[in-house]
């Protein structure tokens, strides 16, 4: 019977109880027996009531994670299953499905003798998920581009109705309605893809916690490294890098440099993506503040990648490269078809949105109407009385139909009709007077 003593830090001023792990070579399972010895603890009645129980539980939990890591490292030959805590929460079913697909891809690549099967399975799964969410990404980019193309119109409305927020909101809403743009359409696809990526992240975390990411990938010593379960749970995920031990990192210079290459590539890819997709420079102070924050965002992501398994960093790097390629295709190469073009062609000018429902009047229409009326007048003057009456009645009927179709021209048409009738009457009186003056021919 072999026993391994694991030392622990002081606990409430006294050492923690002795912990012994027993292993029987004749058994295939691994047992952990904890022996408590209270001979070093003070009497119970002398313990103060202000003991920090939360601190006790936190240290005990950290100790259990340390024991889990020590058990795996002490006896690698005994392939025991480490019980990982799979707390998927609301996205547990998504993470379980992603984990199943990842294992299927890994087994499929291993069956065809592909080296680094787990690393390539992570890359392949990221590509599949990215391709599946491409329609949502395309919809989000199209909505974003349409909103950007409408910004000049929106600014014109704000300048025209400065100080009247209610009118600005009304005109802006009408502008969105006419352009067929929904301001919230750009957010919905992004919100729909968030559970997918959270599930994929949790699936990779579960695989790492289960100890399945033990194989390397290209120059990376292990996809599960460089951190450990205990370091991640205690919040000291970069303890493998700092502090130095005897003047060198804990893992040695070679492995440490190998693990640092991928976070550096991740940071570089983030900056390249930001430079490619950088919006045009403006004098807007809000945009300048946003760009300033984005400059430090890749550094934060790179720092966070130091405290997670390398398998997750591979997923982040692959996802970032694919996202950049998608954005270039959608924005630069014409893959996205926004509802509003770059010049906002066909959209009304600021302050005229209230006329969008009415049909615009054709240019020169009123001039043509006046010319037709003038021709009618000349024709009536040139015709005899017998032909004037039916023409006048026809013109009156036409004028009446026009009045019914267009209320705005009612007064004009009635006045024109009255003028025509007066001219006809005067013309007929003149003809009668001339006939009466004629003498009969002998």
Curated annotation (Swiss-Prot):
Residues 358-371 have a biased composition (Basic and acidic residues). CDD domains: 5TM_YidC_Alb3 (cd20070). GO terms for cellular component: chloroplast thylakoid membrane. Residues 1-108, 205-296 are lumenal. It is found in: Plastid, Chloroplast thylakoid membrane. GO terms for biological process: protein insertion into membrane; protein localization to chloroplast; thylakoid membrane organization. It is a multi-pass membrane protein. GO terms for molecular function: membrane insertase activity. Residues 130-183, 318-442 are stromal. Keywords: Chloroplast, Membrane, Plastid, Thylakoid, Transit peptide, Transmembrane, Transmembrane helix. Highly expressed in apical buds. Low levels of expression in leaves. Not expressed in roots, and stems. Belongs to the OXA1/ALB3/YidC (TC 2.A.9.2) family. This is Inner membrane protein PPF-1, chloroplastic. It comes from Pisum sativum (Garden pea).
